[in-house]
Curated annotation (Swiss-Prot):
One GO term (biological process): translation
PROSITE patterns to which the protein is assigned, alphabetical: RIBOSOMAL_L9
The name this protein goes by in its record: Large ribosomal subunit protein bL9
UniProt cross-references to SUPFAM superfamilies, sorted A to Z: L9 N-domain-like, Ribosomal protein L9 C-domain
PANTHER family: 50S RIBOSOMAL PROTEIN L9
Gene3D superfamilies membership: Ribosomal protein L9, C-terminal domain, Ribosomal protein L9, N-terminal domain
Top-level taxon: Bacteria
A GO cellular component annotation in the UniProt record: ribonucleoprotein complex
Keywords recorded for this protein, A-Z: Ribonucleoprotein, Ribosomal protein, RNA-binding, rRNA-binding
Length: 150
């Protein structure tokens, strides 16, 4: 299925690119989230008319993401208290949602989908540097300190 991208999509293309994707990916992800439209003559004309507006919107989102990245890197270490054993092994784990909630409580909005934990959830106490992807082009690092609850 050929679609016109309305947003920059990782590993697929940029705004305005006409790409061929599997029908299920288009129907279940790209079209419902407003990230693409079906590539037919009428949609091509509508897209070309709205191109400047969409590019301005993308630039504004990028600027907002850069601003949030600066705020996140300016944060001191975000402290998360969790129950732990004697050796520093946590009972449970600290995951994306916990980190996102702690950063949001510290004053910077962060969604759990923006937190990247490539090695899985944090299962020990200590200091960690966690990458957050705020935009396809903007990444930041937040310092997370996991401490044992008293």
């Amino acid at each position: 299925m050929n679609v016109i991208l309305l947003d920059k999509i990782a590993n697929l293309g940029n705004l305005g690119d006409q790409v061929s994707v599997k029908a299920g990916y288009a129907r279940n992800f790209l079209l419902p989230q407003g990230k693409a439209v079906v590539a037919n003559e009428s949609n091509v004309k509508v897209f070309e008319a709205r191109r400047a507006e969409l590019e301005a919107k993308l630039a504004a989102e990028l600027a907002a993401a850069n601003l949030r990245a600066e705020k996140i890197t300016a944060l001191e270490a975000v402290v998360i208290a969790s129950k732990a054993g004697d050796e520093g092994k946590l009972f449970g784990s600290v995951g994306n949602r916990d980190i996102a909630d702690a950063v949001t409580a510290a004053g910077v909005e962060l969604a759990k989908a923006e937190v990247r934990l490539p090695l899985g959830a944090l299962r020990t106490t200590g200091d960690f540097e966690v990458e957050v992807q705020l935009h396809t082009e903007v990444k930041a690092v937040v310092k997370v300190s996991v401490v044992a609850e008293a």
